[in-house]
Every structure is written in structure tokens, then in C-alpha cells.
């Protein structure tokens, strides 16, 4: 593996003391592989490190963290200009790791690191909101957004993705649906939504398959709306097969426009964005990502 080009790992500061990761990096360095490591501590660090990665001429920028870290690195990469832009590698180190899990990134850090450096770089889509903010995995609105943004950090650290479900059950009596109107290509719906999922990827909230048909290189966004007047019946209904569920509405489009009479909040790969009007569009083949050969999200 010594003939592989250099990589730069952008590591979320929360994982800076990960001894297992240090050992994996040292083993690869002993094999002659050049890996630069930079640690983020505040917003904007990832973009600066991507600029540095281009100056160093590395072939891959590896995002080491959860969905938010992957989002920040991917967003910085698609904003790069020029012909030679590094590929994105993924090292899952977050609470839920929804995107990494759904695309088949290995859980073992040494295997994930080798894939991030030596895996095949494949062009994938990314989504953009209101011409500025991006998400690589999913935008969630309604009940799901409030749960993921309000779940205490200590609960997430202790229980991982299960913490979202537990906190959701605790908050069920205070959550109400969002009234909104959604338009897309050959799609129009308006009403009260308990949960809205707009996916480039398939899952969010610690493993919840909100958009089970999503692919990351088909030029489309998948939409799933959970409707209903009460939270508990809607949650119970999600256990039914989709074709039997009257509370599920699906759509697919290269773009969706969402309007609401009041502020609603979308969670974009872990980052909240509030407003009354959202234009969400897919950017086809926006970046290259090193993925396993059997990645289930590729067409």
C-alpha cells in the first residue's frame, strides 16, 4: 500500500483522544502511507483544512466524525474550484453515523481507514438548500427534527441512536404536526406532517429508514411524509408495511419546494435550519466519494 497517494484526515475534536484510531494511523504510516491529521474545534475549521489539503496535493480528504463532520467536509469539497479536487473518505466516529452505515462503511476503524484511502472513488450527488446550505444524507423536519436536536448529549453518548427513540417517547405529549405545502416534479401535497424526510441517503436519527429507496447517484431526492393527528398512532403505524400504511406519502424529484405559514425546522445532517420557505435541489455527481464495491446506495 506504500504507493498510495497521501491523504488528509479531518478529525472531529471529540474523537481526538481515540487511542484505537491513533494505532490504526500509526500502522498505516509504518507501511509507508502518508496521512496528515488535522483536528476541528469550531465551525469553519473543516473548510480551512480542505484548502490546506489541496495545497498539499492529497488525493483524499477523510472526514472523521459523525454525519455533521461528513457534511462539513463534503460541503467544503463541492465549493472547491479547479480540475484536481480530492475525493471524500469517511471514517465513522459519531453517535449515529447514519450515512456511513447506510453506504456500507466498515465499523472497524482500521478497515474504514483503508477504504477511505484506497477505495474506489465514485461520483455521488449532494443536496443543496436555498442555494447555500448542503446535506449529503438527509433533511428531516417535524417530530424527528425536534427529537434529534433536543436529545441530551449525555444520553446520545450512553445509548447512541437508541437515545433518539427514548427521548422521542418522553416528549410525545408536547409535539404537534407541522402544517406545510410541498411541491416537486409531478408532486404536490399539503397538510399536517408529523415527520418529513427528504433523502439523498436512506436513514436518519440513529438508523430510522425514512427514505428506503434513496440512491446517492441517481440525480433524485426521495421524499417521505408521515401524516396523522397524533404522534403515538403514527409511530405505531410505521411498523406496518408501507403499502398498508395510510399515514405514509412518498415522492421522488430532483427538487422540492416547501412552504409553511410558520417557522419549521429542518435538520440537515445534524445541523438545524429554520424558516418558512425551503428550496431543496439535488446536485448530481457533485463530488467523488470512496465507497465499498457493494455499496447498496448505488444504482
From Swiss-Prot:
Enumerate the subcellular locations listed in this protein's record, separating them with semicolons. Cytoplasm
The cofactors it requires, by name, are: Mg(2+); Ca(2+)
Please list the residues that bind Mg(2+).
Answer: 215, 218, 220
Lipid metabolism in keyword set:
yes
User: Which keywords label this protein?
Assistant: ATP-binding, Cytoplasm, Kinase, Lipid biosynthesis, Lipid metabolism, Magnesium, Metal-binding, Nucleotide-binding, Phospholipid biosynthesis, Phospholipid metabolism, Transferase
Q: Name one Pfam family in it.
A: DAGK_cat
Q: Where does ATP bind?
A: 40, 66-72, 95
Uppermost EC category:
transferase
Q: Which InterPro entries match?
A: ATP-NAD_kinase_N, Diacylglycerol/lipid_kinase, Diacylglycerol_kinase_cat_dom, Lip_kinase_YegS, Lipid_Phosphate_FormReg, NAD/diacylglycerol_kinase_sf, YegS/DAGK_C
Which Gene3D superfamilies has this protein been placed in? 2.60.200.40, Probable inorganic polyphosphate/atp-NAD kinase, domain 1 (3.40.50.10330)
Q: Cellular component GO terms, alphabetically?
A: cytoplasm; plasma membrane
So what EC number does this one have? 2.7.1.-
UniProt superkingdom: Bacteria
Quote the cofactor binding remark. Answer: Binds 1 Mg(2+) ion per subunit. Ca(2+) may be able to substitute.
Provide the GO biological process annotations.
phospholipid biosynthetic process
Active-site positions on this chain = 271
> What is the protein's known function?
Probably phosphorylates lipids; the in vivo substrate is unknown.
Spell out the family assignment given in the record's similarity comment: Belongs to the diacylglycerol/lipid kinase family. YegS lipid kinase subfamily.
List the protein's name.
Probable lipid kinase YegS
